[in-house]
Amino acid sequence: MAAPALGPARGCGAELTLVLLLSLFLLLGWAAGGEEAGPEAGAPSLVGSCGCGNPQRPGAQGSSAAAHRYSREANAPGSVPGGRPSPPTKMVPIPAGVFTMGTDDPQIKQDGEAPARRVAIDAFYMDAYEVSNAEFEKFVNSTGYLTEAEKFGDSFVFEGMLSEQVKSDIQQAVAAAPWWLPVKGANWRHPEGPDSTVLHRPDHPVLHVSWNDAVAYCTWAGKRLPTEAEWEYSCRGGLQNRLFPWGNKLQPKGQHYANIWQGEFPVTNTGEDGFRGTAPVDAFPPNGYGLYNIVGNAWEWTSDWWTVHHSAEETINPKGPPSGKDRVKKGGSYMCHKSYCYRYRCAARSQNTPDSSASNLGFRCAADHLPTTG
């Protein structure tokens, strides 16, 4: 497929421009701490799903243990940690059960977080970790697969992760989110453009994978993408009506439990959780079902088509609408901050076109039974 014409909007509605300007003027400096009950009274409303990670290609249809400590230099270009073990890979059983999906207190109403509804889920298996660069490389080496970012010749990268040399060659940005830049040569092997590499981070989540790429990998591995309901049920880790996989406090006992943005978005990420970009797939404590980084770090694709209209009636193993334009992604990423992209909650959700990719978008797989391969 030919490289897309990179228009200024890239799928984020033009109506967000005024909201963005107002938000950037007012939101910088918000602090997220203590009990997380949503944005403070009188604060500007959060913008829509273009938020922290929704650039699109044009024309496309638990645990109480202390958080793991990793060096801030782990994500620095050229850093090659010595003695780091191979990236972990395993699936964990998710028991059958009934849970409350969504919320009656939506923090981003236009995302369709409401209403709260009872959902029954059959038992299944879920990857304990996001698919890593090393695991995705095995797939590519085995099949010769080319990702859509490689076929298009470009992908979206957060400006703060780019070198000055790469930025100097870019003339366009996403109008409603100018920190997203279309970068030629950006793909899963070169997440921050052609002068970057994943050789020093085999255990970090693979990025710049489209929904179609994720499906191809999961199929090869004898797995599938989780439904949105399965993903959210797994995210909650056996807890009911909690914001995060571990409870309602963002930092229990002052510890970081997810890789998200600290500081002023999009100006400065202080990296207080140990990372300014992605973290290893086994960083931070797992939730009650044994899932690591189920929120933060990298957005994760689900199998569902996007809709913001949900029935309040109880359902069994819902799979979303039969067709649509966008696919659902969950979990937020290292770019999420409460002031702008408060989507590192289990009930939060966003969407993107199936062929879109970005430097904060990855996935993990699910399966009805343990596969014989992968």
Curated annotation (Swiss-Prot):
InterPro entries: CTDL_fold, Sulfatase_Mod_Factor_Kinase, SUMF_dom, SUMF_sf. This is Formylglycine-generating enzyme. Residues 341-360 are annotated as: Interaction with sulfatases. It comes from Bos taurus. Residues 1-33 form the signal peptide. Ca(2+) 2 binds at residues 130, 293, 296, 298, 300. It is an enzyme of class 1 (oxidoreductase). GO terms for biological process: post-translational protein modification; protein oxidation. Its EC number is 1.8.3.7. Residues 57-102 are annotated as: Disordered. The catalytic copper is required to activate oxygen and catalyze oxidative C-H activation. Pathway: Protein modification; sulfatase oxidation. The keyword Plastid does not apply. The lineage of its organism: Eukaryota, Metazoa, Chordata, Craniata, Vertebrata. One of its GO terms (cellular component) is endoplasmic reticulum. GO terms for molecular function: cupric ion binding; formylglycine-generating oxidase activity; identical protein binding. Its cofactor is Cu(2+). Oxidase that catalyzes the conversion of cysteine to 3-oxoalanine on target proteins, using molecular oxygen and an unidentified reducing agent. 3-oxoalanine modification, which is also named formylglycine (fGly), occurs in the maturation of arylsulfatases and some alkaline phosphatases that use the hydrated form of 3-oxoalanine as a catalytic nucleophile. Known substrates include GALNS, ARSA, STS and ARSE. Ca(2+) 1 binds at residues 259-260, 273, 275. It holds the Pfam family FGE-sulfatase. Belongs to the sulfatase-modifying factor family. N-glycosylated. Contains high-mannose-type oligosaccharides. It is found in: Endoplasmic reticulum lumen. Keywords: Calcium, Copper, Disulfide bond, Endoplasmic reticulum, Glycoprotein, Metal-binding, Oxidoreductase, Signal. Cu(2+) binds at residues 336, 341. Disulfide bonds join 50-52, 218-365, 235-346. Monomer, homodimer and heterodimer with SUMF2.
